[in-house]
């Protein structure tokens, strides 16, 4: 059964804001969970030939997945901090990634990718703040990067160097894109603006959107004359590019929109928010296709797959969740239960609770701490803090005299 809602002019906004009252009672069954990371998954990308997918994680790694069927193919290690974003080049010969270490790494790809083969990255360059979004020019010659240092980087792939940093946003830049003809650059940020830039000379042209809250994600379709975007106040808006006209306004008050995916050929666009809600829209008439709870916690990224009508979401879990887009369950289900990691079901000590909520994102309790950002906590009692080799520790921790025991962990 497919829920497709159409709205009459003039009442669209009123009706849409009432949707959570009845649509949130529908929670569909996940098709499968895909596990390869050791921490939350922040970014997703799919190759142009639809044969591979990449996921970026807090565990400092990127996993390349083979599709049809979906299986882990390669784990890429090179970043020195959480990886936030990843993109395949139009030519499919490169993968670019950006992370909390402020760096952009280029990964050369040779198809078909040999399973478990190690790939050495090249350092393309770095920002002064973490890198949160990337985009290739349509000809595959240049890369755009969005950073929390407030700038947009333009990078020459062949020369492997920065051409220019564009500055104009007040605060972090959240998202960046090339126009289809490579003549323009679009960017959005904390300041609530979607800006238009000249891609040739880097000159700022004008704001396309002035929003009261930060614009987390956006898509521009020049041919159909619309800009769709999600903001930190929880609203999804669709406006005309050259007119001050709102086509659609939908959302959940004060729950930030964190991710977005535009499947242009299928006229579908999807949004994920900070509470695990997925909203999928038909861009031909801006009717609702799906609105449901996909995960507990933020949806940092999502991808729509046209071939099998499925959706993959990434969030706080160390696995990806794959859903069927169109099939609802035969009966109304309860909301998903507490997540296994962040909400312990039984009464536990404060130390156990803190590990369940926070520490297990980066640490394990087993000897092999592979694919975790931090050191293993195996046999931690009696160990002095900051003494395990192979990890970077803060000066404060190195100077501390903390010995891990039941008391220090519980406190």
Residue ranges and their predicted role:
Residues 53, 95, 143, 185, ...:
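Hydrophobic beta-strand positions that form the internal "hydrophobic ladder"
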Residues 327-354, 370:
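Electrostatic cytochrome c docking/interface patches
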Residues 371, 375-411:
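Extracytoplasmic electron-transfer domains, predominantly the class I c-type cytochrome c fold
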Residues 34-41, 76-83, 124-131, 167-173, ...:
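WD40/WD-repeat beta-propeller blade N-cap
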Residues 345-366, 377:
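Sequence/structural segment immediately N-terminal to covalent heme-attachment motifs in c-type
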Residues 56-59, 98-101, 146-149, 188-191, ...:
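Conserved strand-to-loop turn within each blade of WD40 beta-propeller repeats
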